[in-house]
Amino acid sequence: MANIKSAKKRAIQAEKARKHNASRRSMTRTFIKKVVAAIASGDKAVAQAAFAAAQPILDRMATKGLIHKNKAARHKSRLSAQIVAMQ
């Protein structure tokens, strides 16, 4: 455990940020899973709606630095391709 006051403060701040980031990361994964589930169900309209909801979340998390911008782009590209390929 830290002994210096500033180190104690940074430890508290780091823990607070870790919890916040974990929550945001979980939310992001949930949105992606909803799109994947909609694609698996075969309903294109539902998949498109879920993708439309997930897209700004991925962009926001990339902007905030929670995930890399290329990772967000990769998720969006792959999900979009799967939706386009649906019958």
From Swiss-Prot:
Pfam families in the cross-refs: Ribosomal_S20p
Name of the coding gene: rpsT
Domain of life: Bacteria
Role, per record: Binds directly to 16S ribosomal RNA.
Any one GO molecular-function label of the UniProt entry: structural constituent of ribosome
InterPro entries: Ribosomal_bS20 (IPR002583), Ribosomal_bS20_sf (IPR036510)
Disulfide bridge map: none
Family, similarity comment: Belongs to the bacterial ribosomal protein bS20 family.
Official protein name in the record: Small ribosomal subunit protein bS20
GO BP annotations, alphabetical order: translation
SUPFAM superfamilies given in the database record: Ribosomal protein S20 (SSF46992)
Keywords per UniProt: Ribonucleoprotein, Ribosomal protein, RNA-binding, rRNA-binding
Annotated region described as Disordered, given as residue ranges: 1-26
